[in-house]
Amino acid sequence: QSVENFDLIHPEKVIQMAMKNMPIDYFEYYTTVEPFAEGYYKIGKKEEARKILNQLIKKQQEKITFFNSQSEKQKAFYAREINDDFRRYYMLLLIAEENNDLEFHRQQIVKFNNYNKMMGDYGVDLEQ
């Protein structure tokens, strides 16, 4: 059977298959999942994009909350990792903003700023 005879797979099906094989709750390489949120935005599936972003944001919030529970010595030791987690968190918000999901972005940026304040000196200084 020639390649011409195969139907093209709809982008939504590709994203669904990928998300099925990389479940966020069990798969730690979260940056590889971000493009699927972007993909959902591109095909007009805003709620699906938000669902992925919310799951990824929750993971970042959990990590930041964990670091916040640590001693100052531990926070200092993990300062670079904390900074990286905040930057990953912020990048998730940019996905929504760049895809004109401004309502979601506005809601989430408030939460981001609260987590940033919670970490005090270990938060990040991002121009928003």
List each language-model region with its residue ranges:
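C-terminal luminal/periplasmic domains and tails of membrane-associated envelope-modifying transferases
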Residues: Q1-Q128
